[in-house]
């Protein structure tokens, strides 16, 4: 395997074993460090359990060595839309950490929630509004810090019918949705 990848994120990353799907698409070795509900800021903070695990992975398992190493980072499901400045700070720290370990940083930007979902109603915005804010917040953070950008918000917003993409909760991806996420990330890495 020529690629080694560290993926960090929450249940949107872990759902349906998406890192395994991506590993198969890229013929890569992927170490996934996930925690449900986690914010990206945790993963670059060595004082947190997840941050400590990230440092161990970068320092100790070979993910930092060799050609074609990536750190793929995913933030809390709504943070780019609801607190873009906190999102950008977290992306900046993760990009710095990746580069300190000779890895290319990749931002896996997530999507807006499905129209009518309970979590979207709680945020008080439409699916289109959330999708646009997710796209803008993540694009801005990736561009400001030189990260490769896998833009799932834009990809999902452009679907004529995105119902197949979502699990029943309207937030997480379905198995087919996770496969689409893996394919979109793979395309971004191959550019």
Question: Each predicted region: which residue ranges?
Answer:
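Sec-exported extracytoplasmic/periplasmic mature domains
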Residues: 17, 76, 95-103, 139, ...
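Conserved beta-strand segments of alpha/beta enzyme cores
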Residues: 29-31, 104, 146-148
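Tryptophan-centric aromatic hotspots in well-structured domains and transmembrane helices
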Residues: 68, 111-113, 185
């Amino acid at each position: 395997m020529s690629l080694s990848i560290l993926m960090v994120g929450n249940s949107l990353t872990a759902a349906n074993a998406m890192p395994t799907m991506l590993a198969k698409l890229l013929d890569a070795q992927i170490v996934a460090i996930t925690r449900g509900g986690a914010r990206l800021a945790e993963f670059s903070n060595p004082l947190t359990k997840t941050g400590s695990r990230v440092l161990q992975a970068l320092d100790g398992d070979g993910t930092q060595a060799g050609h074609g190493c990536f750190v793929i980072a995913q933030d809390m499901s709504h943070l780019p839309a609801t607190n873009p400045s906190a999102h950008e700070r977290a992306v900046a720290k993760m990009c710095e950490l990746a580069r300190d370990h000779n890895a290319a940083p990749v931002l896996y930007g997530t999507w807006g929630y499905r129209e009518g979902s309970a979590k979207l109603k709680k945020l008080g915005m439409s699916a289109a509004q959330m999708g646009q804010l997710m796209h803008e917040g993540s694009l801005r953070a990736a561009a400001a810090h030189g990260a490769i950008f896998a833009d799932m918000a834009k990809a999902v917003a452009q679907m004529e019918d995105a119902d197949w993409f979502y699990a029943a909760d309207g937030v997480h991806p379905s198995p087919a949705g996770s496969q689409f996420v893996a394919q979109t990330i793979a395309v971004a890495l191959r550019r």
